[in-house]
């Protein structure tokens, strides 16, 4: 669990923003959402494979861009 120390005369909004940034950096919320419901191993593999395929096609698309004609 990320913790922050609130400095003297520090506004609450600034401390809250620092805390949110620390939580996001640790990946706590994404892990919590992933573990909220049980996911069968086959479903997890299928989802990860689909994400990998999507990343692959996205990478290929970005490499095959035509040259810009100004």
Curated annotation (Swiss-Prot):
Gene3D superfamilies per UniProt: Ribosomal protein S8
Protein family: Belongs to the bacterial ribosomal protein bS21 family.
Species this protein is from: Chromobacterium violaceum (strain ATCC 12472 / DSM 30191 / JCM 1249 / CCUG 213 / NBRC 12614 / NCIMB 9131 / NCTC 9757 / MK)
Pfam family name, one: Ribosomal_S21
Annotated protein name in UniProt: Small ribosomal subunit protein bS21
Taxonomic classification: Bacteria, Pseudomonadati, Pseudomonadota, Betaproteobacteria, Neisseriales
Entry GO terms, CC: ribonucleoprotein complex; ribosome
GO MF, any single term: structural constituent of ribosome
Any one biological process term the GO annotation gives: translation
InterPro entries xrefs: Ribosomal_bS21, Ribosomal_bS21_CS, Ribosomal_bS21_sf
Taxonomic superkingdom: Bacteria
